[in-house]
Amino acid sequence: METFAAVGRVFFAAGGRRRLMDAAAYDAWYDTPRGRWIGTAEFRLLSRLLQTQPGNTLLDVGCGTGWFTRRFAEEGLLVTGLDPNPDWLAFARAKDPTAIRWVAGDARSLPFPDRSFDQVVSVAALCFVEDERQAVAEIVRVARQRFAIGWLNRASLLYAQKGQGGGSGAYYGARWHRPDELLDFFSGLPVRRLAVHSAIFLPAGNRVARTMERLLPHTLPWGGLVAISGETE
């Protein structure tokens, strides 16, 4: 199984390849020691950036099998997971049939009114959406307080290993961006206090990787997952 959250997000775009993957196998990867470490590191970063409080409403755009969605629900949030793939949504519903609202939808045209959620998150999903700028605008539109969006980072060791030449394995066809390129997606949008953070500096997941993940500040822009967070105006 490939590294971190992008594996389950690779096929988010309409007509994309995620429909070829097995939802159960992807979700089970997070039960492995390496998968659990990577997923937890990413979740902790995104949760901190969102500044959530119990009882807040949160939308997970491109939720896939709902691994991150369930983690946010465990923190006492009122969570909605959105994904275009009905098979993956069915898997997510089976894992959590009552506490979370699961919605079929497209990131480029979110089926919610303006300012519907206190926070909005997306984890390595927009890298595979044809119009990322439109998807970002939609996330900002439905967020009432804060948002955090994770992308695959071109300025990372993971890119050197998996992203060059069009990408390999689960990363084939993904768009990789440098942090300054991502900030341009927010130009002209009603946002403030944009910040860049990253996680998973050494994707191998061994003891050295875990130690470095604890020691390095997440303000360094070199992790495999780069997150842009901010507030809506």
Question: Where are the model-predicted features located?
Answer:
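A short glycine-rich, Lys/Arg-flanked "PGG" loop and its adjoining helix->strand segment in the class I
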Residues: R133-F147
